[in-house]
Amino acid sequence: MKKLAVVGAQWGDEGKGKVVNYFSRDFEWIVRFSGGANAGHTIYVGDKKYVNHLLPSINPVIDSKGFLGAGMVIDVGQLIEELKILERDFPGISSRFYLDPEAFIVLPWHKEEDLLLEEMRKVPIGTTGRGIGPAYTDKASREGLKLFVLFDEVLLRERLEAIYHMKKSKYNRDFAVSIEEMLVYLQGLKAELERLSVNFTSAVDMYRVFRSTSVLFEGAQGVLLDLDFGTYPFVTSGACMAHGVSSVGFSTFELDSVYGVLKAYTTRVGAGPFPTEESTEVGGLLRERGKEF
């Protein structure tokens, strides 16, 4: 069965969501393998527009399913809001999404830390402020939370206490959300995920499923924002290229095709090198016509 990866070939915002949405009619599974809510993928159903930051760009009107892999950093509150929007028009669609329990959680502390770090930098990198960098940092430093921790209240409290005190010591300040408030917040999100009937399934189990069916791997951002191959340090913190499918247990050698998406003109969000930047009224016209805001 066919395995296809769709990735951005510029700085993101190339229209990957539309491409994925178009091809989704031919694939049973749409898989996000990296990134977080700093990505924005637009899909259309008829004349109605949906913008997802975390959810894979499945086609709501056919029986395709979505999987969020372990390489992602997930703002669970944002995820639930996206599910609720789709549920209004497509009741029961949440049960067609599957989460890897090994995926990392973006906490409100990460967002606060993101903005704090940007203020401290001599040269700002243009962060989106969504906590992506600090979340990936905690993941690499083994200091954060994965989704499976939500189902163990004792472990959840222990981890939150450890994370909070580590950050308080690091920045010599208290954070806006207390440990108790964070605990209540996360327990509420867990209950909401259960109410929406979202599935939790490991990549090991999903790999067996994916081997025997058609899968479209949906990339986030673009190659020039990739942590290893982008315009460092003005990059994102995750894998933007096809090699990121390894977080779902796949090798690039198992892919039948990799499609790189471009648009006729180039845009980028935030700071960093942009050799073809057009600062005249022509650039303004392109922004206006292309709705690049």
Feature-to-residue mapping (PLM):
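Non-transmembrane, aqueous-exposed alpha-helical and coiled segments at domain scale
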Residues: M1-F293
